[in-house]
Amino acid sequence: GYVGIPMAVAFAEKGVKVIGFDVCKPKIEAYLNGEDPTCEVGTEKLVKTLKGGNLSLTYDLEQIRSANFYIVAVPTPVNEDRSPDVRPVEGASEVVGKVISKGDYVVFESTVYPGLTEELCIPIIEKFSGLKYKEDWKLGYSPERINPGDKVHTFKTIKKIVSGCDAESLDKIAKVYEMVVEPGVYRATSIAVAEAAKVIENSQRDINIAFMNELAMIFDKMGIDTNDVLDAAGTKWN
């Protein structure tokens, strides 16, 4: 999707062997044909990267078994009652659990409530892998910050929050992302802290948009230009 494909291309451009996986066969076939439905990478760069040999794309689960570092970037929509739909995360955890081996790392990027990655994903991965958490494999969380359609603030240009289940995994995960993220990374003190930071980012943006929308409607009824108000208010330093 719009998170996974630019990330896969970015790592491949740095010489990393990347296997992009999606359960949606038509989507993978489109990418292999040089089509980028997300418009985040573009046909020219996608084709060039695929021809470069470092990036392969597949819908065949067995082909990702050889990987040792898994980054999961699945959506987290909401249900009709506005509760989070965690089925994509559950499904991805099952997929990872079926293919990981001892010594592997699993990093989730999906936007979730604090605690979900550890509460939900660990038991599922352990169940399907038969491997013991921390002893056999390590977990991390690094919230995606991509702004769809933004060609300035991209995966490579936005500082990345990273977290791990222990000091060793945090260091490993940080070094992986530092290979491609130009501004570097911020090492969060825990997975829950990283999850909470992402929730705050999204909430702050939504609150600001809603607040300004309300003000704009009020100002419009008063015959006041909202942009003029913002220009005036923006002269204060905070």
Q: How would you describe each model-predicted region?
A:
Residues G1-N238:
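Structural/interface elements that position substrates and couple domains in central-metabolism enzymes
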